[in-house]
Amino acid sequence: PLDCDEPTTPEFSAPATAVRALLALLRGADMTEQLTVLAKTGLCALSEEQVCALENYAYTWSPNAAAWRAEFTKNPKGFGENELTDEDRQNLAWAEDARRKLVDAVDTLRGKVKGGNAEQISRAVYFCLKELGAEEQQAGLVEDIRAARGIPAAEEAAREWNVVMQLLDEMASLLGQQSVTV
């Protein structure tokens, strides 16, 4: 048999994207962009409806950092609508639930890394992913891929997670107590 393996890199995998988004948020990057990127990785314990509602709300209202930390209360359809329909209320609830989960996790992460060294930052990023449900979501994704595309594809998805987590471990090992500016 002829095997034609394609070289792959975890650089653009969901785990790497999630870690990059978290690090960008720690550096003070735009919350709207990075929180929606994080939500769309599929590694947060959010339903597809919650992710869509969050992204639509963020697109409609362009919340600043302060607005992300406050409860979402505006009509998901925008300025022109006064009365909330049942669908609007549901979308608002989904967006608010997603906002709260993401912002709470990121704010906890910020508190843990403030003035921290490389080891503390690596550990805090891992535990933030864990708080967001990333391990369970990744395991579910691997099983879905196994059922749809077979064992080799599932093993590749699992490898992507393992490589990114190993990179966090190596950062902690190599830099240890060194101060790192995120």
For each of these PLM feature ranges, what is it?
Residues 1-182:
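Polyanion-engaging groove/track-forming segments
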